[in-house]
């Protein structure tokens, strides 16, 4: 079998140059200017059509959505619970009541959080009727109910600037996550329990941990711009015999049949658990 004759290097270079540009036929990379123009025109029209189709499809979809209210809201039927301050160490509070530096971050977080609830920031909010859902479906601009810091009692930061941390009675603020259109039934309230009986005495502000219905429903950030979530302050009076011990606390929403507090797939649905350890 004869071997193929290898082309000289100069011949290969000449053929490559001719392929890139053929001066006899005026072809560039094997195509004339007309051929290149037709190909570019085809792809311009083709991809332009795809872009226009995509844009039109997105425009049609956006026409079905509201800027104010999510279209689908059935996946989240019950709110979760959140607390403030929120420790960096996985919802575990560690502090020394004799060392201001150990709880300084907690106090700072609470002060900053409550700034939005200051009377000066609620000038556009109104006094609502307690115990009654505040429906505003027929009003374009929704009014927000005033939340008075005095409702938080000893945890308001007015009388005790350390929110009880310097006295061994730390305060934790509990709130429900916002859900547009949610109308709690019954008389919802927050109840916290300790897994170590007798380790801590729990006090609530407002009394009984009540969450007033007048703060519902919520209409969304756009329509309800000045809305403030109702808060429940939980004050933990730690027993002197329980210092240097880790105390597990769990808070739940109770008193409302349409607010869930048990779900194995979502540990924050209607409840929240945290730990507190105080030293002296």
From Swiss-Prot:
Topological domain ranges for the Extracellular compartment: 63-280
A biological-process GO annotation: sodium ion export across plasma membrane
| Expressed in which tissues | Predominantly expressed in brain.
Residue spans, topological domain Cytoplasmic: 1-37
Q: Which Gene3D superfamilies match?
A: Na, k-atpase alpha subunit (2.60.40.1660)
Q: Which UniProt keywords apply?
A: Cell membrane, Disulfide bond, Glycoprotein, Ion transport, Membrane, Potassium, Potassium transport, Signal-anchor, Sodium, Sodium transport, Sodium/potassium transport, Transmembrane, Transmembrane helix, Transport
Segments traversing the membrane: 38-62
Family label: Belongs to the X(+)/potassium ATPases subunit beta family.
Explain the purpose of this protein.
Answer: This is the non-catalytic component of the active enzyme, which catalyzes the hydrolysis of ATP coupled with the exchange of Na(+) and K(+) ions across the plasma membrane. The exact function of the beta-3 subunit is not known.
Name of the molecule in the record: Sodium/potassium-transporting ATPase subunit beta-3
Q: Please report the organism this UniProt entry assigns to the protein.
A: Gallus gallus (Chicken)
């Amino acid at each position: 079998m004869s071997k193929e004759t290898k082309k000289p290097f100069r011949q290969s270079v000449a053929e490559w140059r001719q392929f890139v540009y053929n001066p006899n036929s005026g072809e560039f990379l094997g195509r004339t200017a007309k051929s290149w123009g037709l190909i570019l025109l085809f792809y311009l029209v083709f991809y332009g059509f795809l872009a226009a189709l995509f844009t039109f499809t997105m425009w049609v979809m956006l026409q079905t959505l509201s800027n104010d209210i999510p279209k689908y809201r059935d996946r989240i039927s019950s709110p979760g619970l959140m607390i403030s301050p929120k420790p960096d160490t996985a919802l575990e509070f560690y502090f020394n009541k004799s060392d201001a530096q150990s709880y300084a971050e907690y106090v700072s977080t609470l002060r900053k959080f409550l700034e939005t609830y200051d009377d000066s920031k609620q000038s556009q909010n109104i006094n609502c009727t307690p115990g009654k859902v505040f429906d505003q479906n027929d009003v374009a601009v929704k009014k927000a109910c005033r939340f008075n810091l005095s409702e938080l009692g000893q945890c308001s930061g007015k009388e005790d600037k350390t929110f009880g941390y310097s006295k061994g009675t730390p305060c934790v603020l509990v709130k429900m996550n916002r859900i547009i259109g949610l109308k709690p039934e019954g008389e919802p309230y927050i109840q916290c329990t300790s897994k170590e009986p007798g380790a801590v005495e729990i006090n609530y502000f407002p009394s009984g941990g009540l969450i007033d219905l007048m703060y519902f429903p919520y209409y969304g950030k756009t329509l309800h711009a000045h809305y403030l979530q109702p808060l429940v302050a939980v004050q933990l009076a730690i027993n002197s015999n329980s210092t240097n011990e880790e105390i597990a606390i769990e808070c739940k929403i109770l008193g409302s049949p349409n607010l869930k507090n048990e779900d194995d797939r979502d540990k924050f649905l209607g409840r929240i658990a945290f730990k507190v350890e105080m030293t002296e």
